[in-house]
């Protein structure tokens, strides 16, 4: 019974294109929520003991400590259902009552349709003509990885393309994909060094996480390859400021940084802001105009519009 419930949850989530599944403990029940794009929807409330058992089932499959319900844990697994496999990342933590919550991130290893409100892939691709470093920023689930893979197919067809990811999210036969495994020394730093020996035309680096990775990404860009990577920031200006915080100099950025793309999924589609220079002075007028248009066309509410606008103070 527990396994059947778990499989039905994953089946339903995959059908909806869900990025995240939330098991939220309440006083005497569990609430189940799913996030699709920028919307987090409540699916229902369920028997507490039954869904606590479902959480234990997922933890067991992911190799986590089933008996530990207070401390946070991370896990991952390839979950089998209906003769299919779903790649999952799990995170658990207990609240003050010792009731455990679970978040499951679904890695959709097949390509997802990426719909933009005001641009298409061909139009966006015109911004990526020069060799060097291109950075993609935006929240989790905003389509950064999908956009990087779409651009790699349209701009680097038949060329040497490599990726370094943690984990590999979209499996591609037309590129060499490497996956982090720090336990055996496969760190971002080491894999970047290894990949450069293969002389890639495009190197996709999953995420700039720290100063070490930032320095390695800059060095890779200086070899003449085109490099795509993601970074956590809330705007184009924020990307530039984050790189400086990580120890990359303005002189280095002037040489290697060819473009910054900031994107979000809003109202069921993506919107993009792009800059190829003057990152520190970038204005949010184009972004805010797109938000205003979505509001005018009835795709978002006035509250959403107010929340999604960017203001540089």
UniProtKB/Swiss-Prot annotation:
Recorded superkingdom: Bacteria
InterPro entries named among the record's database cross-references: AAA+_ATPase (IPR003593), ATPase_ComGA (IPR047667), P-loop_NTPase (IPR027417), T2SS/T4SS_dom (IPR001482)
Residues that, per the record, bind ATP: 138-145
Locations listed in the record: Cell membrane
Membrane topology: Peripheral membrane protein
Gene Ontology MF term list: ATP binding; ATP hydrolysis activity
The keyword Cell division appears for this protein: no
Keyword field: ATP-binding, Cell membrane, Membrane, Nucleotide-binding
Family: Belongs to the GSP E family.
Protein name: Competence protein ComGA
Gene designation: comGA
């Amino acid at each position: 019974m527990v396994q059947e419930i778990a499989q039905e949850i994953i089946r339903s989530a995959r059908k909806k294109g869900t990025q995240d599944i939330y098991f939220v403990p309440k006083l005497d029940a569990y609430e189940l929520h799913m996030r699709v794009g920028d919307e987090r929807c409540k699916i229902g409330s369920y028997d507490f003991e039954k869904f606590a058992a479902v959480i234990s089932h997922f933890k067991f499959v992911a190799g986590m400590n089933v008996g530990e319900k207070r401390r946070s844990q991370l896990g991952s697994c390839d979950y089998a259902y209906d003769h299919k496999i779903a790649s999952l990342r799990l995170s658990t933590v207990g609240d003050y009552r010792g009731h455990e919550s679970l978040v499951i991130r679904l890695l959709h290893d097949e390509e997802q349709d990426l719909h933009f409100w005001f641009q298409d892939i061909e139009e966006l691709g015109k911004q990526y003509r020069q060799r060097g470093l291109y950075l993609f920023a935006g929240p989790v689930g905003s389509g950064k990885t999908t956009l990087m893979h779409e651009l790699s197919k349209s701009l680097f067809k038949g060329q040497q393309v490599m990726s370094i990811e943690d984990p590999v999210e979209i499996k591609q036969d037309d590129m060499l994909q490497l996956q982090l495994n720090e336990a055996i020394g496969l760190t971002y730093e080491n894999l970047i060094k290894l990949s450069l020996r293969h002389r890639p035309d495009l190197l996709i680096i999953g995420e700039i996480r720290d100063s070490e990775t930032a320095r390695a990404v800059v060095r890779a860009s200086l070899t003449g390859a085109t490099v795509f990577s993601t970074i956590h920031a809330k705007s184009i200006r924020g990307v530039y400021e984050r790189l400086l915080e990580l120890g990359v100099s303005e002189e280095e950025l002037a040489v290697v940084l060819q473009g910054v793309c900031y994107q979000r999924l809003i109202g069921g589609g993506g919107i993009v802001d792009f800059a190829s220079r003057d990152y520190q002075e970038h204005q949010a007028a184009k972004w805010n105009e797109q938000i205003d248009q979505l509001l005018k066309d009835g795709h978002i509410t006035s509250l959403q519009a107010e929340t999604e606008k960017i203001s540089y103070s």
